[in-house]
A protein has these predicted regions:
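Structural signature of tandem-repeat unit edges
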Residues: 15, 38, 42-71, 78-97, ...
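C-terminal capping region of solenoid repeat domains
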Residues: 235-268
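Flexible coil/linker segments and helix-coil junctions enriched in charged and small residues
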Residues: 22, 26, 190, 235-237
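Leucine-rich repeat
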Residues: 130-132
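Consensus positions within tandem repeat domains that build extended binding/scaffold surfaces
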Residues: 74-76, 99-101, 125-128, 152-154, ...
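Small/polar residue-rich beta-strand/coil "junction" motifs that cap repeat-based extracellular fibers
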Residues: 76, 154, 206-209, 231, ...
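Intrinsic-disorder/low-complexity detector
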Residues: 1-47
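A generic structural signal for ordered secondary structure
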Residues: 28, 32, 40, 103, ...
Length: 268
């Protein structure tokens, strides 16, 4: 196990973290950290600590990192370039106050798959995504392999991707707040696959926040239509979207004028 100690990297910056009254500190490593490929660490796992932030790094293999002691990410990967197109990750802890596990990520491949395994997660936190190398193109696949207990701003400010595919089971989620919060996203598509909201008791209706125009949202799974109908009937944020809800092979599209779901076709 590799432990990253003080002064082992070129620069270490300490600054107070005050979000939500949290006055603890986090480390910021900048410049020269290249995933161990040039410092002889490439054969061992790199241990990450709670609150650590890696900035401006080239990440060749995210699976080489040990997240076992990380409880709050705090923009853990800030403006990092990711070179592989497949990751099988496992996070443990409460990520609600992270400010983003990945912040301004830059993918070197146009089509990236992230398999994100949730274990003991109360809140997933956020991906702040910017595909700087391939703007407005590519597809991000994110699979949540365990049930989400509390969803809070999972994806935010998705400038870079033409399509986001999110696979997950939200049937036991006790609350929703801004699962997607985006700006500058005209012409994009997000696909919610198996978006099962389960029992509506104690559910927060603010599922999406700051929604820009021309998103196509495809919802599949067992989501109660009534929940999304209330969202769409708001009339200020949702009914400019092309909503599609899939139930089995039936494909239902919400008519914002008639304010009702219309059977629009069948999936193969």
């Amino acid at each position: 196990m590799i432990k990253i100690e003080k002064n082992t990297l070129q620069q270490e910056v300490w600054f107070p973290r005050t979000e939500r009254g949290n006055n603890t500190f986090r480390k910021t490593y900048q410049d020269g950290f290249d995933d161990g490929y040039q410092d002889g660490l490439s054969s061992s796992k790199i241990k990450l600590y709670d609150g650590m932030q890696l900035a401006y790094s080239d990440i060749y293999d995210l699976n080489r990192y040990d997240f076992s002691d990380v409880k709050s990410g705090g923009n853990m990967f800030y403006n990092c370039r990711f070179y592989n197109d497949y990751y099988d990750l496992s996070f443990v802890g409460d990520w609600n106050d992270t400010g983003g596990i990945f912040s301004r990520i830059r993918l070197k491949n146009r089509d990236t798959t992230m398999i994100v395994k949730l274990r003991e997660i109360r809140s997933f936190g956020a991906f702040y995504v910017v595909d700087a190398d391939y703007p407005n193109s590519g597809t991000l696949h994110c699979t949540l392999t365990e049930k989400v207990k509390d969803a809070y701003m999972m994806f935010s400010y998705n400038y870079g991707f033409g399509t986001i595919n999110l696979y997950g089971d939200f049937s036991e989620c006790t609350g929703f707040r801004e699962i997607v919060n985006w700006i500058n996203s005209d012409g994009k598509t997000i696909n919610f696959n198996h978006f099962d909201m389960g029992n509506e008791t104690n559910k927060t209706e603010d599922v999406f926040g700051n929604t820009s125009k021309n998103w196509t949202i495809r919802i599949s799974g067992n989501s109660p239509r009534s929940t999304f109908t209330r969202l769409l009937d708001d009339g200020t944020r949702y009914n400019h979207l092309d909503w599609t809800y899939c139930y089995g092979k039936e494909r239902w599209t919400y008519d914002a004028v008639k304010k009702e779901w219309v059977l629009s076709g069948y999936d193969d």
